[in-house]
């Protein structure tokens, strides 16, 4: 295998060719950073968190594929992943995950002690999540904690503390993660039932679509509460109203449980996150200019 071919397999293992996971992890982290900084985050902290998100999401994908290496070959969507094909060895995968995590840890060294301490929890969550699919009926909830942990870290980095709104925002985001990752799990539901993997789509059963909608609605209600806690203005709520419209469109996509349309709905959540972020940024900019 040539070096170029090996690098392509590493790229696929880290999902750099499919950045949706990075974006879904990045948006709530940016929400938290902007709210903590009241619209003016420090540039160095912003850069560290953007790069750290890319590194840790990549490491998480490598660990996920390592954990699922004996299952992925039996699932239509994942059978061509590098570990499932044997194109990358388990030793290479573990070394790659460790290297990415080390670089991410070195990246946050300029930040305060609380942020560094929280990073150990974030690392544990990212590394342990893939194994929860073997025994936990709702692994998407665990993923929600892992994918939301950039929020308290952002508050800690910017303010030196993690106040109540940070934890509340984390809880709201957890519901969003359950919603969109259930859509993702609906794509593989038949295969997961056959091989014994546990997911929220299986746990919800015939109420999977209802579960997605309820989690999305609870998420938006939580974001309304965040707006009240942070004294955000009308532009923020316009952003939330737009996000509601996007979510209603997702319901149209998933109601018949077609695999391709469920996957499209999952991808569509990027626009939900981006819209809410735009609402936060613009709200602070307008208030600063007035």
From Swiss-Prot:
Catalytic activity: all-trans-octaprenyl diphosphate + 4-hydroxybenzoate = 4-hydroxy-3-(all-trans-octaprenyl)benzoate + diphosphate
The UniProt record lists the keyword Transmembrane: yes
GO BP terms: ubiquinone biosynthetic process
UniProt keywords, alphabetically: Cell inner membrane, Cell membrane, Magnesium, Membrane, Transferase, Transmembrane, Transmembrane helix, Ubiquinone biosynthesis
Protein name (Swiss-Prot/TrEMBL): 4-hydroxybenzoate octaprenyltransferase
Biological role: Catalyzes the prenylation of para-hydroxybenzoate (PHB) with an all-trans polyprenyl group. Mediates the second step in the final reaction sequence of ubiquinone-8 (UQ-8) biosynthesis, which is the condensation of the polyisoprenoid side chain with PHB, generating the first membrane-bound Q intermediate 3-octaprenyl-4-hydroxybenzoate.
Coiled coil: none
Segments traversing the membrane: 20-40, 43-63, 92-112, 114-131, 135-155, 160-180, 209-229, 231-251, 266-286
Disulfide bonds: none
Alphabetized HAMAP family for the sequence: UbiA (MF_01635)
Highest taxon above the source species: Bacteria
Annotated InterPro entries: HB_polyprenyltransferase-like, Prenyltransferase, UbiA_prenyltransferase, UbiA_prenylTrfase_CS, UbiA_sf
Family in the record: Belongs to the UbiA prenyltransferase family.
């Amino acid at each position: 295998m040539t070096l170029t071919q090996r690098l392509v397999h590493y790229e696929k293992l880290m999902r750099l060719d499919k950045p949706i996971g990075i974006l879904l992890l990045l948006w709530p982290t940016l929400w938290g950073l902007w709210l903590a900084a009241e619209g003016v985050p420090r540039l160095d902290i912003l850069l560290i968190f953007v790069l750290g998100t890319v590194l840790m999401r990549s490491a998480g994908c490598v660990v996920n594929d390592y954990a699922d290496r004996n299952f992925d070959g039996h699932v239509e969507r994942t059978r061509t992943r590098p570990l499932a094909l044997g194109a990358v060895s388990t030793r290479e995968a573990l070394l790659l995950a460790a290297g990415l995590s080390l670089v991410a840890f070195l990246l946050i060294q300029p930040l305060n002690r609380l942020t560094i301490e929280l990073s150990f929890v974030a690392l544990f969550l990212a590394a342990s999540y893939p194994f929860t699919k073997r025994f936990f009926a709702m692994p998407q909830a665990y993923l929600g904690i892992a994918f939301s942990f950039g929020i308290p870290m952002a508050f800690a980095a910017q303010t030196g503390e993690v106040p109540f709104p940070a934890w509340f925002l984390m809880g709201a985001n957890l519901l969003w993660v359950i919603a969109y990752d259930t859509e993702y799990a609906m794509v593989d539901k038949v295969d997961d039932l056959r091989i014994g993997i546990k997911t929220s789509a299986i746990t919800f059963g015939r109420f999977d679509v209802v579960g997605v909608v309820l989690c999305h609605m609870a998420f938006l209600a939580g974001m309304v509460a965040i707006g009240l806690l942070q004294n955000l203005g009308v532009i923020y709520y316009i952003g939330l109203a737009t996000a509601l419209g996007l979510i209603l469109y997702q319901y149209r996509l998933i109601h018949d449980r077609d695999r391709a349309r469920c996957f499209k709905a999952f991808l569509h959540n990027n626009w939900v996150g981006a819209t809410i972020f735009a609402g936060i940024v613009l709200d602070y900019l307008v208030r600063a200019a007035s």
